[in-house]
Amino acid sequence: MNGPQRSLPSFTGLQVVHDARLGFSILIPDGWQRLDVSDSSADFYAPDPADLLTGLAVEGRDLGTEVQPGDLATLRRGFLRGLRELAGSKVESREAEAVGRLISLEARHTFRDGDVIRKRWVRLLYQGRAQVRLIAQAATVEQFDYWEPMFYTAIRTAHFGTFT
């Protein structure tokens, strides 16, 4: 083996977070702190409450109008346009699909925040009038790579409904 191998974070468990109003659920790594985000209705879950640049933001809202699978192309264009508005944004990967009434958009991208390059994974879920926005971000690209297994579990378990 060449060089030291960096360990990855280890799971001690997962906690279920359910939004009864909009009907979505997500699994958050056990031990992550829920923090209030000023000027936002999002919940922010951080592995270290002293590092507000690393963690997962979860926000659901009622759009007031039904989103249909036929809206996918329009949503995708607006989503990518929004990502590209960030300074130095580079989209690394993107996906968009409609399955039944569910629409899912996601992208991984880097952007410049002052002198620092940050990395995010954004996923939007739409069903009916509900939108769920998930943003996994780390203070640096290297920290994102470290926390990615935890981000993956949270982002991929988000769904409309409950865990049974």
Residue spans for each PLM region:
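Short aromatic-glycine motifs in intrinsically disordered, low-complexity regions
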Residues: 14-27, 147
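Surface-exposed amphipathic alpha-helical segments
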Residues: 32, 132-164
